[in-house]
Amino acid sequence: MPNSRNYTRRRVLSVAIATAASPASVLSLDAGGLSDRRIVAESRFDVTSAPLQAEVVQLVVDFPPGAWTSWHTHGGQAINLVLEGEITLRHAGMEHPHRAGQAWTDSSGEVHAAGNTGRGKARLLTNFLLPPGCTQTTAVQESPFEPAIAYEVRFPLSALPAETEIAQQVADLASGWRAQRASVGFTANIVIAGEVTYQIGGERKVYQAGEAWSAPAGTLVGEENRSAGTARVFTTCLLPRGTGR
């Protein structure tokens, strides 16, 4: 059975220290045309100490111009994907700008902060992978103008293989889109705009923006946009290294 949760809010956002991104593979579908499903952004990284990970977190965070996180550390690996605008990462006296479509990851405890130095809104998608008992965020110095967490969901993880990758993908689903697939690895999915109907195993439900589900590897998932408008989904998959989605 899928796990389904609405978002909760937290005051402090963690953002990780930068490394280069690598592209994620395209989701394999058995119905619908490619024009009906548009990949907006994606990333793929190795998971650090995969067998130790006990929880996955999905965050959708909005940065108004001038908003910055606290200076902070985090207790597990963070994977970050800029969806809109530009996010600047500060650490060790350096600044690293990341534009829409760029991603980075880190599992270090180094103190850092991230913010929006541009004129328009920025949106950041973050995954945390947390071992048992680890704190998601530890603030060192508070920010006077924090970004806003739009959505946050978390799901427990079963034991992962030592060689595991995490793939993030944001896709727009046109009205009338319909597809079915079997999940290759553990999958967590949150609707971030519009609504999508999912058939997950034996359960069928309409998911609104901010609602999420997870399913283990091998679960048959049906996906359908029955609304009049385009829907947007943020999907995280934990995959054996080298496999497609």
What are the language-model segments listed below?
Residues A24-A41:
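C-terminal segment of N-terminal export signals and the immediately downstream linker at the start
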Residues V57-T73, S107-S108, E165-S183, A217:
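Conserved short histidine dyad/triad with adjacent acidic residue
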Residues W68-S70, T88, W104, S108-G115, ...:
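Histidine-centered metal-chelating micro-motifs
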Residues G75-A92, V184-G201:
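Glycine- and acidic-residue-biased ligand/ion/polar-headgroup-sensing regions
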Residues G109-T135, G218-G244:
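Ligand-binding loop in jelly-roll beta-barrel domains
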Residues C134-L160:
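Surface-exposed beta-loop interaction hotspot
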